């Protein structure tokens, strides 16, 4: 499972209707990790710990399906699996044959059967995990991953682990720590930061190619190793987020955010009759967007398809 802009080809009719394909649902606004790089620590948000109740989830999810959403991602915000109603929520999704995925730190064991379960691991031992995620939980997460796949269970769920790469040395160490696990993919991601402030132009031209080359060398002997597509988008700065329509993100109160990386920009509420119109008309400051982000490549496709083309009758 991967975020892939080519998936948009399967939804060509939506370029006209501009109705969302994927929904990101924040089940909580609190977390059991303390990651220093967390997107949601950058912004000043409303205080107080909150979670989406089961009844509210069913109401919001039903509304999303009415709007045409095809897939749901349980994410945050906070850590989705520590929502007290998490098991009831996933049971409802599965009983209604709704395709969904989970982004989690997996500090708490859960036993659902989503399309994918992506574990943000980021460390290769207890100390590196504590340094990157603020708590001692590495061994617990590894055991939870093993337990999830024990006795041949959940073979229809695409199970993966990922790391946000900071330096060359950790690439090999991370791989050595997870290569024996029964996972379907091992993802190496770049840092996502406001207008790419984490990387200088020199980093993109010199350091990043060294990192990606090393990741690719590992992938040659282990097909599970994935070089995240965002590595190739570090020098792409869209002029506008024309592909924002492809996703819709709601927080634990049902508020629609402009996107999952901008929780401070509230467009309206998912129950508003005109919420898609409000979202289409909302203006965001692109200079405060993350570069790269999941929609970077989709924005390139949107821009290409929006351009007038001469002699398009000849293919």
Q: Model segments located where?
A:
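Radical SAM enzyme [4Fe-4S]-AdoMet core and its adjacent flexible, acidic
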Residues: 47, 66, 87, 99, ...
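Flexible mid-to-C-terminal extensions adjoining Fe-S/redox cofactors in radical SAM and related proteins
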Residues: 1-19, 41, 253-315
């Amino acid at each position: 499972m991967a975020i892939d802009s080519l998936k948009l080809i399967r939804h060509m009719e939506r370029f006209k209707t501009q109705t969302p394909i994927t929904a990101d649902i924040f089940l909580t606004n609190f977390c059991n990790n303390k990651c220093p790089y967390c997107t949601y620590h950058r912004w000043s948000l409303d205080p107080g710990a909150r979670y989406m109740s089961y009844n509210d989830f069913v109401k919001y999810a039903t509304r999303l399906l009415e709007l045409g959403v095809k897939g749901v991602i349980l994410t945050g915000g906070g850590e989705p699996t520590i929502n007290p109603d998490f098991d009831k929520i996933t049971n409802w999704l599965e009983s209604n044959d709704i395709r969904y995925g989970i982004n989690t730190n997996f500090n708490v064991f859960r036993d659902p059967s989503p399309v994918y379960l992506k574990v943000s691991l980021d460390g290769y031992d207890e100390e590196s995990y504590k340094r990157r995620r603020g708590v001692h939980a590495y061994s617990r997460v590894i055991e939870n991953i093993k337990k999830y796949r024990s006795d041949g269970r959940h073979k229809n769920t695409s199970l993966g682990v990922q790391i946000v790469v900071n330096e060359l040395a950790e690439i090999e160490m991370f791989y050595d720590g997870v290569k024996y696990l029964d996972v379907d993919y091992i993802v190496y991601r770049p840092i996502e930061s406001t207008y790419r402030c984490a990387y200088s132009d020199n980093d993109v031209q010199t350091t990043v190619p060294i990192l990606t080359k090393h990741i690719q060398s590992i992938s040659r002997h282990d097909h599970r190793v994935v070089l995240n597509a965002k590595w190739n988008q570090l020098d792409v700065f869209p002029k506008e987020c024309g592909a924002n329509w492809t996703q819709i993100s709601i927080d634990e109160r049902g508020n629609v955010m402009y996107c999952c990386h901008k929780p401070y920009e509230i467009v309206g509420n998912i129950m508003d009759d005109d919420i898609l119109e409000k979202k289409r008309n909302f203006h965001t400051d692109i200079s405060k967007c993350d570069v790269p982000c999941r929609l970077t490549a989709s924005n390139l496709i949107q821009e290409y398809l929006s351009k007038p083309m001469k002699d398009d009758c000849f293919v």
